[in-house]
Amino acid sequence: MKTYKEKMLILLVEKYRKSKKDSGTNVICRRTSISPVELYKKYNKNDGDLEEIEAVNQAAEACSRDGFLTFENNGFSSEIAKIYLVDEKVEEIEAYLESACGYESKSRKRQYVEQMIARYSGISPAADRECERLKGILVQNKIPNSYLQTEEVLKALTFIEKNETPLYVREASMMIYGSSKYLEENTLESVCNLL
């Protein structure tokens, strides 16, 4: 189970990676922030568990000592109002999360997509079109939403375009994925749209 420290850092990094700051198209310079309520729903409530609230506070203080984030308190209390990411430390935070809880960083996802493009480009026309679409997304410094699903689709596209013998859908699914219903249940619609 992830600790509040890991949850806090993951929320901040994911928010940063989805922002325009990461892609370089931002116009307004705004800090990446979360509220403690995103970590523990009853943080600001009177019936909130004090141990949980204190655990969130200690996690924020530990991350602040590591230089990963800063936070603001409400007035003179120990209650945290906002938690802010230190943008310059994003790669360092991702490396920490990767070792601590197996988090997959953006650079690792990007590397995986680039390898997938290299593996499937040039095999079939439909796969080439999909690889070009993926390259366009990578140029914008973004990661395709369902890149793992896209690899399954590319695998099916290349098989179907190379195949010359008539097959039933389940036979093709067995030859591609090793499961008779995987193609039918998961990737058939996407494959048909691309063909």
Predicted ranges, named:
Residues M1-L195:
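Nucleic-acid enzyme cleavage-core boundary/entry regions
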